Amino acid sequence: NTIDWQAIATLLEVFKMTHDSMVKEWSERNFTEAEVNFFANKDFQQSKVENDELWGEAKSLMDKDPSSLKVQNFAQKWMNSANSKYIGNPELGKKMWELMKSGDIPEGLIPGYEQEIVLFMNKAIGILYSKK
């Protein structure tokens, strides 16, 4: 029983191409060319560590009451981060949020993304803005 590493490598490459074409189709279905260009001009790698931390912290708070002080403070931090990513294009941020709430995100596109986390954060953010 030898492992055919070449076959595995070929399978992984096919999977990557399939995933890339799925992401491309999803992008074309949901965004205008200008919006795709907005994303293309962003350095998402730079914010990857921050995003990983945000998703991890959000997940760790899901057993808390969304109106608790700890979750509300985090909701403000989450919004500060989100707003900084969509400077000059807040409507695109809202569109992306709606896609995340609906679960219409290709698997692996946003590391750490889980629809349940987004729905929890949506409750917390709703409470945050109802107090302002």
Q: For the regions a protein language model found, what residue spans apply to each?
A:
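Amphipathic alpha-helical "stalk" segments
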Residues: N1-K132
